[in-house]
From Swiss-Prot:
Provenance organism: Shigella dysenteriae serotype 1 (strain Sd197)
Pfam families referenced in this protein's UniProt entry, alphabetically: GIY-YIG
GIY-YIG domain segment(s): 2-77
Family statement: Belongs to the UPF0213 family.
Domain of life according to the entry: Bacteria
InterPro entries in alphabetical order: GIY-YIG_endonuc (IPR000305), GIY-YIG_endonuc_sf (IPR035901), UPF0213_domain (IPR050190), UPF0213_GIY-YIG_endonuc (IPR022992)
Protein name (database record): UPF0213 protein YhbQ
Record HAMAP family: UPF0213
Length: 100
């Protein structure tokens, strides 16, 4: 099984874009060449700010959703220190118990 990664790209105007992929370098190059997400087209210089393996596609999608819900300050902390990423992944991997 191919591992999935969560990544954050910083735009020229200091915004952070969150995405998932199986190949961070390939996806970053797609964004750089304008063939990636429309949200990044015309945003100037892009830099890869953060990437981390997250496991399978399902977990990657949940992690992406959760990171997109974070505030800019929380995302900046994640980029700078990786703070909270392990806990975030752990919370996503914990099975939820359904009550009847």
């Amino acid at each position: 099984m191919t591992p999935w990664f969560l990544y954050l790209i910083r735009t020229a105007d200091n915004k952070l874009y969150t995405g998932i992929t199986t190949d961070v370098e390939r996806r970053y190059q797609q964004h750089q060449s304008g063939k990636g997400a429309k949200a990044l087209r015309g945003k100037g210089e892009l830099t890869l700010a953060f990437s981390a393996p997250v496991g399978d596609r399902s977990l990657a999608l949940r992690a992406e959703y959760r990171v997109k819900q974070l505030t800019k300050r929380q995302k900046e902390r994640l980029v700078a220190e990786g703070t909270g990423f392990a806990e975030l992944l752990s919370s996503l991997q914990t099975p939820k118990i359904k009550s009847d």
